[in-house]
Amino acid sequence: MGNKMIKLIDLKSLQQFKSKGFELNDKKIFAVFKDGQYFVYENQCPHLGIDLEFMPDQFLDADNALIICSTHGALFEIQTGQCVSGPCQGDHLELIESKVDQEFLWVSI
């Protein structure tokens, strides 16, 4: 995106939801909390360029272990965005630059 950092969400809320979608400057992104870490990706499957979630803020599989594309069931590693199963295997989600402070997750726009 850019290099101006904006506040996206408070950390406690994201920890509760596990994943959450946002729209910033007409760009759809989503954040995921896993194992004490925060990851932010563009909400776009590399296969067809469509949104990933099947319901608002539902980006993870039933075990909250992988990001899933609702259209063709492609599975992505949360930590890397790498597609490990499905029609885009070997491709990856676009990582959005982010940082955390004591209370909030910030993203670069």
Region roles according to the model:
Residues 1-23:
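Zn-dependent metallo-beta-lactamase
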Residues 21-108:
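Rieske [2Fe-2S] iron-sulfur-binding domain
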